[in-house]
Amino acid sequence: MAFEDLLDDPVVQKYLHELVGPKGMPVAAAPPDGEVTDEELAERLGLELNDVRRALFILYENDLATYRRVRDEDSGWLTYLWTFQYENVPGNLREEMDRLLEALVDRREYELENEFYLCEVCSIRFEFGEAMDLGFECPECGSAVEAMENTDLVDAMDDRIERLRSELAVEA
């Protein structure tokens, strides 16, 4: 996938937005060619320097940017020259999907192995042991808690797990 096409993909845009947030999105969405300083980016994008630096470090922590330090011989100050590494985005998304699949499988197992009770007034859910300790009464409002059917939730998880496994080409 070409670099420009990658940034046009709504999934990639959402991923970057989740990483850097709304203040960092201009930094993530408009990476320059070659090296650039944080000051240059802040000036070009009209952003606060701290917001640019925060976004750059988040991108760095996620292997989407690298930097090299150059010391000014006159002042002794360090300048950081940043390069964007968006070719790592597909791999990062794959890792996120793998983590999501693992979490869903674990959660599905938890849902199947436990019996739940619900306070319909407060919408608080309790495991059987906790409900029993509470005398099957909600500690918030005193209403009786009722056995909760979670088949729809498990079915939705099954569907999502199946779709993720299909997208990732992973077998059960």
Curated annotation (Swiss-Prot):
InterPro entries: TF_E_archaea, TFE, TFIIE/TFIIEa_HTH, TFIIE_asu, TFIIEa/SarR/Rpc3_HTH_dom, WH-like_DNA-bd_sf, WH_DNA-bd_sf. Residues 8-90 form the HTH TFE/IIEalpha-type domain. The keyword DNA-binding applies. Transmembrane segments: none annotated. The keyword Transcription applies. It holds the Pfam family TFIIE_alpha. One of its GO terms (biological process) is transcription initiation at RNA polymerase II promoter. Keywords: DNA-binding, Transcription, Transcription regulation. One of its GO terms (molecular function) is DNA binding. Belongs to the TFE family. Transcription factor that plays a role in the activation of archaeal genes transcribed by RNA polymerase. Facilitates transcription initiation by enhancing TATA-box recognition by TATA-box-binding protein (Tbp), and transcription factor B (Tfb) and RNA polymerase recruitment. Not absolutely required for transcription in vitro, but particularly important in cases where Tbp or Tfb function is not optimal. It dynamically alters the nucleic acid-binding properties of RNA polymerases by stabilizing the initiation complex and destabilizing elongation complexes. The winged helix domain is involved in binding to DNA in the preinitiation complex. Monomer. Interaction with RNA polymerase subunits RpoF and RpoE is necessary for Tfe stimulatory transcription activity. Able to interact with Tbp and RNA polymerase in the absence of DNA promoter. Interacts both with the preinitiation and elongation complexes. PANTHER family: GENERAL TRANSCRIPTION FACTOR IIE SUBUNIT 1, TRANSCRIPTION INITIATION FACTOR IIE, ALPHA SUBUNIT. This is Transcription factor E. It comes from Halobacterium salinarum (strain ATCC 700922 / JCM 11081 / NRC-1).
